[in-house]
Amino acid sequence: TLADGIKLFFKEDLIPDRSDRFVFKLAPFLSFVPAFLSFAIIPLGGDFRDGNNGMVTWFGHTTRVQLADPPVGVLFALAISAIAVYGIMLAGWSSGSKYPLLGSVRASAQMVSYEAALGLSLGTVFLVTGTLSTSGIVAAQSSIGNWNVVATGVVPFVIFLIAATAELNRPPFDLVEAEQELVGGFNTEYSSIRFALFYLAEFMNTVTMSALIVTLFFGGPQPISFRGTVLDIPFVPNGIEGTIWLFAKVLVFLYIYVWLRATLPRFRYDQLMDLGWKVLIPASLGWFMLIAAQRLGRDQGWNTLVVSAVSVTVLGASYALLQAAFKVSAKQREAEGSMF
């Protein structure tokens, strides 16, 4: 892989005659730069034990082990990930070729569809932690029982993982660059360093999304702790130990992405859209309403079981009506299609 990367640097940078030259040159950077910008708000370490806020003191200076900690850090990450859509879309449009154009159309539809599920799945995280700051979210996950994957009931994590995989165009959702259908997808006409930038952006996005999953759902740089027992790394200061824990957790999700690539077949395009719009978005909305009702009932002193039962009943009825609407719409389309 390293040899292939070096080889690409010395290849000729070809630009198609029918392309929009300025946009064609700009598109790789619109994909490459956002892949690194999202890492700015991820805590890469720090001391979050015993209620600490992640600050560490190195060489007489007290600081966080992250580039920036805005109060809306998670929204920043979601906004930056949306910019990468433009890089892929413009790359296909500016190439002046049909296959890249089809790949970019697929990319825009797929990524916009799954961005909705991605953002909605985080609503329960904000509801449980009470903050949009990444350092605040990490600080709220002091033990395994407080990890958001447990506190939110696993479902938001599963939705986020599926939506993130689709957002990254990773298998089994890699319809943007399906070789059997689109030759190489949106980057078919690219070569040399610009081609390498797209692949570097894809791999870096996988690392960034894995780090974001760990930060939001698995305690980030927090060590593994259960019922007061902390799994320490001997002879390592707390500030550096957090970095080691973050790196180890990220490696687990990188392994999961490689495992998914090797085991699952590619989805059909209609299956991809149905999963996003008919399953993930309703599920994330329904789960958010359920968690919100439970927390409201707890604050008001209501019976949690009764509140949960009523919420599940209402959500189940709503989902049944939604499925009925889908079936009626499908029958109408079939009837209209049979007229021609």
Language-model features: locations:
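Selective transmembrane helix interface/packing segments
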Residues: 1-340
